[in-house]
Amino acid sequence: MILRTILAGLAVSLCVTAVIAQTDPVKTRENLMKENDQHAKVVVQMMRGQQPFDAKKVEAAFAQWADTAKQLPGLFPKGSEKGGDNRASPKIWQNKKDFDQKAAAFGKAVADNRAKAVASLAGLKQAVAAVGKTCDSCHDDYRLSKR
């Protein structure tokens, strides 16, 4: 009975967290980008030989990035231009179609390179180069520099 109560409490808290995240797109995208960055750091450390190649960690990174690509277009509704540690350029809302196309290109690069990345360190290096170009393309146009 106690276990059921604990599990029910956890379920409710997770649902509340999800609802809060959905109602605050700025916070949601900030958290998403922080998660992306954490995964990127692990992958880069592998590429530099600072930690051993680990296919499970690479898969986790690519899964995170694939999820990000799916969520990105919906995380920039009108009215979410300000708030939080918002580095989103106003150009996103002025050129939303282009922004969404860049998010789709990121998703395609992640999908196209995922198997290669998980297979070997050499594949990871090639995959990250391809995926990184799509990250840079969007960040160069649509991310403000740190204040």
Indicate residue ranges for each PLM-predicted region.
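N-terminal targeting/docking segments
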Residues: 1-2, 19, 86
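Bacterial N-terminal signal peptides that target proteins for export
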Residues: 1-10
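Processing junctions and N-termini across compartments
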Residues: 15, 129-132
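Sec/Tat signal peptide C-region and signal peptidase I cleavage site
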Residues: 15-21
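Extracytoplasmic c-type cytochrome modules immediately beyond a signal peptide or single-pass transmembrane anchor
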Residues: 22-130, 147
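The canonical Cys-X-X-Cys-His
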Residues: 131-142
